[in-house]
Amino acid sequence: MSDTEERVKKIIVEHLGVDADKVVQNASFIDDLGADSLDTVELVMAFEEEFGIEIPDDAAETIFTVNDAVKFIDKASS
């Protein structure tokens, strides 16, 4: 597991209060982890703060899963 993935998972567990075992790469924030639209906005803000990046609204609207977040963050950080 990459450092980015570990940090993303930690943020998700903290913000959504879900079991870390449920936070797998293909887990959907809404369908699998029980997030609502406000939760997803808060997750994006937490990712921005944790990784020191900006996630534009149009990009945020394409981040649905743990893997989507990890891929975007890795690309934005490189």
UniProtKB/Swiss-Prot annotation:
Under the cellular component aspect of Gene Ontology, which terms does the record hold?
A: cytosol; membrane
Q: Which residues carry this modification: O-(pantetheine 4'-phosphoryl)serine?
A: 37
Which InterPro entries is this protein grouped with?
ACP, ACP-like_sf, PKS_PP-bd, PP-bd_ACP, Ppantetheine_attach_site
- Which GO MF term does the entry hold, naming one? phosphopantetheine binding
> Pfam families under this entry?
PP-binding
Q: Which domain of life is it from?
A: Bacteria
Q: How far does the signal peptide extend, from start to end residue?
A: none
Q: How is it modified after translation?
A: 4'-phosphopantetheine is transferred from CoA to a specific serine of apo-ACP by AcpS. This modification is essential for activity because fatty acids are bound in thioester linkage to the sulfhydryl of the prosthetic group.
Q: What is this protein's record name?
A: Acyl carrier protein
> What is the species listed in this Swiss-Prot or TrEMBL entry?
Bartonella bacilliformis (strain ATCC 35685 / KC583 / Herrer 020/F12,63)
